[in-house]
């Protein structure tokens, strides 16, 4: 079973994504800030990580850099309301960029692109 982590300071987005991921067969959890995400990423490995770029206690970019010191293989999907960040996010090595707001269909399509779903 693939493991997924959602990192976003909006609890509603975390709950929605975790619910959808669990329904699709993932073991999924979430963190609401950089501090808790750093602790989680330092002690656990994940196959898929959703990261918001603008978190209450830090930058999603810093978090991505921190993650890459531990894990170079996890797929990272940036979810952000700032469409202008797409190119920068892709340049730092994320797998996909999804603008907010997004739909369940958008998430499902992203998981297909990254080969997490077969159907």
Task: Identify the meaning behind each predicted range.
Residues 11-29:
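Two-component/phosphorelay signaling modules centered on CheY-like receiver
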Residues 30-48:
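Acidic, metal-coordinating helix/loop segments flanking the phosphotransfer/catalytic sites
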Residues 52:
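Active-site residues of response regulator receiver
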Residues 61-72:
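Short amphipathic alpha-helix used as the core "switch/output" element in two-component signaling
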Residues 62, 82-98, 108:
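Alpha4 helix (beta4-alpha4-beta5 surface) of REC/receiver domains from two-component response regulators
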Residues 77-79:
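Hydrophobic/aromatic residues positioned on beta-strands within the core alpha/beta folds
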Residues 102-112:
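C-terminal output helix
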């Amino acid at each position: 079973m693939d493991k997924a982590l959602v990192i976003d300071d909006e609890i509603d987005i975390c709950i929605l994504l975790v619910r959808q991921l669990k329904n699709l067969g993932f073991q999924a959890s979430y963190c609401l800030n950089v501090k808790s995400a750093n602790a989680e990423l330092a002690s656990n490995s994940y196959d898929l990580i959703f990261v918001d770029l603008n978190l209450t206690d830090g930058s999603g970019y810093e978090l991505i850099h921190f993650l890459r010191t531990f894990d170079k293989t996890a797929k990272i999907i940036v979810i952000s309301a700032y469409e202008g960040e797409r190119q920068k996010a892709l340049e730092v090595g994320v797998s996909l960029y999804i603008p907010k707001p997004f739909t369940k269909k958008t998430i499902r399509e992203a998981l297909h692109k990254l080969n997490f779903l077969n159907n």
